Amino acid sequence: MVSRQEQFEQVQAVKKSINTASEEVKNQALLAMADHLVAATEEILAANALDMAAAKGKISDVMLDRLYLDADRIEAMARGIREVVALPDPIGEVLETSQLENGLVITKKRVAMGVIGIIYESRPNVTSDAAALTLKSGNAVVLRSGKDAYQTTHAIVTALKKGLETTTIHPNVIQLVEDTSHESSYAMMKAKGYLDLLIPRGGAGLINAVVENAIVPVIETGTGIVHVYVDKDADEDKALSIINNAKTSRPSVCNAMEVLLVHEDKAASILPRLDQMLVAERKEAGLEPIQFRLDSKASQFVSGQAAETQDFDTEFLDYVLAVKVVSSLEEAVAHIESHSTHHSDAIVTENAEAAAYFTDQVDSAAVYVNASTRFTDGGQFGLGCEMGISTQKLHARGPMGLKELTSYKYVVTGDGQIRE
């Protein structure tokens, strides 16, 4: 096993091969990575079977689905890499140019970060997405996956590096930390001078540990306590469609709804319909029904478990939904601001003034009017695959694409000027 220190030194030694690579060279490398990923399907699936067998019974079925790979999912991962090829190269973009009275020309241009570290949990697709985005944005990457997905991740990284071996970019620009202990995560948090940026992707425990302990600059990809508020002026059919999509299309992801707020004028009519759609109809279709966590007002209209205080602060990532009835738009916004992780929140309303108030007052990375929160995604936003959803405000906010993985520098051109 290569030590962490050796890996940090290896990636530092070769980072220039990607930091200054041309768009053509990077695109050729990405295509080679995608081809070798598909070519290694058999090896990746064998590794994934080992991870699945080890994880079964230890994690939820929803989380097992995150871990699971088949040939179609591997092809989708390769397709995601190829889609990055089509994205404009951000490196070298001139952001601003000005000329001073003394003749100096100051150009602000986009440059790579350098080396980006990513700590993430059991999601194999993050490996290929992260490698593609960091490479296209001119960065080397150090990956530290969750223990549950290590065999799969190792097989994926092996395939990606084999692709790079056919190009002029050194394969060591992609590093996988072989040690999956907590100590390896903490070593990355303290790797100042080796990592220019650290991005955690996972649950609240992981993210909080990184934010609280890292001395390397961090972009926080926060958890998603995502709200949908059904206003008194909502179209009920529209609301039900949005709720169904936001909760059931893929409950294990961070842009899935976790809390439903309903105006009291709509509760008596929409909540029984919601119960029929999310419980009765799903049971009839052989699907897992939604388990409600209800406040006292909501429990008057639908059956379910009484909500505990912490249910409104929980990212369930499962077929569980907390429901609260509110008396006004202002109460809904106040609740969101008290419990939100500032990820994605939505209002369903036909009232333009209510929509404007909601979008002005809710301080989240993505705020929706009459649309599902499931759209908070780099691909859906036209950014290609994403590095994560940033819930902070410094440097990056919302889906992080290529530009969010870059910095800038000033190039000052003169003709012998000196400062008097």
Curated annotation (Swiss-Prot):
Question: Where, subcellularly, is it found?
Answer: Cytoplasm
GO MF terms held by the record:
glutamate-5-semialdehyde dehydrogenase activity; NADP binding
Family annotation (Pfam families):
Aldedh (PF00171)
Q: What class of enzyme is it?
A: oxidoreductase
Instruction: Extract the InterPro entries matched here.
Output: Ald_DH/histidinol_DH, Ald_DH_C, Ald_DH_N, Aldehyde_DH_dom, G-glutamylP_reductase_CS, Glu-5-SA_DH, GPR_dom
Q: List the disulfide bonds.
A: none
Q: What GO biological process terms are annotated to this protein in UniProt?
A: L-proline biosynthetic process
Q: What CDD domains does the entry give? A: ALDH_F18-19_ProA-GPR (cd07079)
List the pathway annotation. Answer: Amino-acid biosynthesis; L-proline biosynthesis; L-glutamate 5-semialdehyde from L-glutamate: step 2/2
What Enzyme Commission number(s) appear in the record?
A: 1.2.1.41
Chief site of localization: cytoplasm
Q: Which reaction does it catalyse?
A: L-glutamate 5-semialdehyde + phosphate + NADP(+) = L-glutamyl 5-phosphate + NADPH + H(+)
Entry's Gene Ontology cellular component terms? cytoplasm
> Where on the tree of life does the source sit, at the highest rank?
Bacteria
Keyword tags: Amino-acid biosynthesis, Cytoplasm, NADP, Oxidoreductase, Proline biosynthesis
Its job = Catalyzes the NADPH-dependent reduction of L-glutamate 5-phosphate into L-glutamate 5-semialdehyde and phosphate. The product spontaneously undergoes cyclization to form 1-pyrroline-5-carboxylate.
What family is reported?
A: Belongs to the gamma-glutamyl phosphate reductase family.
The protein here is known as Gamma-glutamyl phosphate reductase
Q: Which organism is it from?
A: Streptococcus pneumoniae (strain Hungary19A-6)
